[in-house]
């Protein structure tokens, strides 16, 4: 704890509010809320914590706080601050967690479409469905049963679906709006689970077609009835009152939380959402934060009712979720919350079981690798790779694996400073010398094994730097790829030789992951540098365009091509004067003309 934090801790008020932890760069890494700011913030810097909280605390070099009038106000502010700053230690809902809905548009002649986003007053929504496949299957079934409008063509224009007998827009609907309204009502009833009348109508049509000897048409009606029956069986009835509701349950253990949400529509469980994440606050408070983010996400439909567990404050939930909040006390409804909670416990236990299994496998892999190479167990492995194109923008990267897992906070990037042209050996020599001379000088933690991406030449260069230039005794190995650019051989020893490594062994998979990761990290860094260099060279020597404005353009547009495609107004919106914008556009045009000239 530094002196600044010590001083600020003495000044904390006994009030509700939000606190924002910052790292050495001034970046907000965690946002929390508290009923009592003094007690909560001080708790981070006193006593012992679990590993993940210690990691958070180790990065805190400053904090701010905002006092609020109430705990409810603090909760709302916390949710907004998290969404604005996206701190790395806060709960993050998965980006791909939006579920598909079926939507009846509110056009004059409505259509049935699939969407993942809900817009207020933009139509009727049904769902969510577990995935796109299920939503499409339901829509295809509806398209065959109901001949409503399916395209955006003008109402008086014949479309493809009309010829298939799946659209009546050109005929009946064009003249009879009431018929159209009845058709949409039938679709609503179907999607709300009231499909008995529809099945009865289809069965009557099937029998009539059979009597007319129109067996193909009868078979189509039979298949439609079968499709509806199949869809029914995939939905478990959870409630007899046919109400739309979301049911929340959560479970905490070993510093982790699992939240389960059951989506119940028309009394049927149609999908569940599962999210697991580490929590640093009080469990109930982190659950409230999760709920706030869940519904503010705009991807989740807010039902008529939301069920919550007994331990959660109803008033706080009601402040962030605009619907009826129920804390069931007895009977079937309480059992539903208990079921969601039980599923959360099972999911969390499964995660721990998988983690334990993974730890055992990984621990075995690094132990076996050490035995194979006849070295101490390589708990810490540092791997290196170079990246350049014909010697331009040369860079290198280092990744670190601790206990067989990536330690991304220890990753390092290197711009090659002393090498001219495409010389991988010289580049590797420079990078290894820079890295391990610093390790030696500053007493940093040394790895148990160094891995270089390459063959005999790369390994010999690495050994020369480590052993002869720096006088260190760190084992060095090389990973060679085959013609398909896949991990193939492990080189080690004195003299170097190929180490026999079973292709299906855990240690081979570990080395394969390490090689892929260092290659990915190096190539990504090289692309960033190359793009920035290209960007800078094009925009050099433009009056009024200094480093800060160039950086602003790079962050916003990413590439010169994107700037060339942008309008003057879009560039000026970044705060760049019109005269400078005109100079930028002229420079890009001149460069393009120079390249196209013979």
Swiss-Prot record:
Keyword Cytoplasm (UniProt): yes
Database matches in Gene3D superfamilies: 5' to 3' exonuclease, C-terminal subdomain, GIY-YIG endonuclease, UVR domain, UvrC, RNAse H endonuclease domain
Annotated localization: Cytoplasm
Predominant subcellular localization, coarse grouping: cytoplasm
UniProt key word Iron-sulfur: no
PROSITE patterns in alphabetical order: GIY_YIG, UVR, UVRC
One example of a Gene Ontology biological process annotation: nucleotide-excision repair
Stretches assigned to the UVR domain: 196-231
Record keywords, A-Z: Cytoplasm, DNA damage, DNA excision, DNA repair, Excision nuclease, SOS response
Listed Pfam families: GIY-YIG, HHH_5, UVR, UvrC_RNaseH, UvrC_RNaseH_dom
Entry function: The UvrABC repair system catalyzes the recognition and processing of DNA lesions. UvrC both incises the 5' and 3' sides of the lesion. The N-terminal half is responsible for the 3' incision and the C-terminal half is responsible for the 5' incision.
HAMAP family associated with the record: UvrC
Database matches in PANTHER family: UVRABC SYSTEM PROTEIN C, UVRC/OXIDOREDUCTASE
Oligomeric and partner information: Interacts with UvrB in an incision complex.
Name assigned to this protein: UvrABC system protein C
Organism taxonomic ancestry: Bacteria, Bacillati, Bacillota, Bacilli, Lactobacillales
Gene name, Swiss-Prot/TrEMBL: uvrC
